[in-house]
Design a protein with these regions (language model features):
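Classical Sec-dependent N-terminal signal peptides that target proteins to the secretory pathway
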Residues: 1-18
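Terminal low-complexity, poorly structured segments
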Residues: 2-6, 35, 44, 69, ...
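Intrinsically disordered, low-complexity segments enriched in Ser/Pro/Gly/Ala and basic residues
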Residues: 12-15, 39-41, 112, 124
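Immediate post-signal-peptide N-terminus of mature secreted/exported proteins
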Residues: 16-53
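Compact alpha-helical subdomains of small soluble proteins
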Residues: 47, 53, 57-126
Length: 126
């Protein structure tokens, strides 16, 4: 299983970003992170590419720690909810972001419902 995931990550890191999802991802970022709107277009693009690298690194950490990709997606959901995004805003951000980063297979196969994510978020945020 670990080898399969590492192979996917290697393949993903060798592919280019999916520009079809860039505009949607930028719009969704602006909905949660108001300061994002103050960046120039090239700064936004750089920030998204950096975010893709961060997501890939976080996924590797989760895999190395023996955690599931479902748990990794829960972490990504919580991260943006803690920043003030509504459940719908976070879901609307994560899907185009993961597609932009070339991680569409991960989110399609391992995403539980929004209700599931929010229920778990409420448990930990008390």
């Amino acid at each position: 299983m670990k080898r399969y995931i590492l192979l996917i990550i290697l393949f993903i890191s060798c592919t280019s970003y999916n520009d079809a999802y860039q505009a949607e991802t930028i719009t969704m970022y602006k909905n949660i992170y108001t300061e994002f709107a103050n960046l120039s277009e090239s700064q936004m693009e750089d920030k998204l590419k950096l975010e893709c690298n961060i997501i890939e690194d976080e996924m590797l950490v989760h895999v190395d720690d023996g955690l599931t990709l479902n748990y990794f997606l829960e972490y990504e959901y919580y991260k943006h909810r803690f920043q003030g995004g509504s459940p719908e805003q976070v879901e609307s951000l994560l899907f185009p972001l993961f597609y932009f980063c070339g991680l569409d297979e991960i989110i399609e196969k391992h995403w539980n419902s929004l209700d599931y994510q929010e229920k778990n978020y409420k448990k930990i945020s008390g």
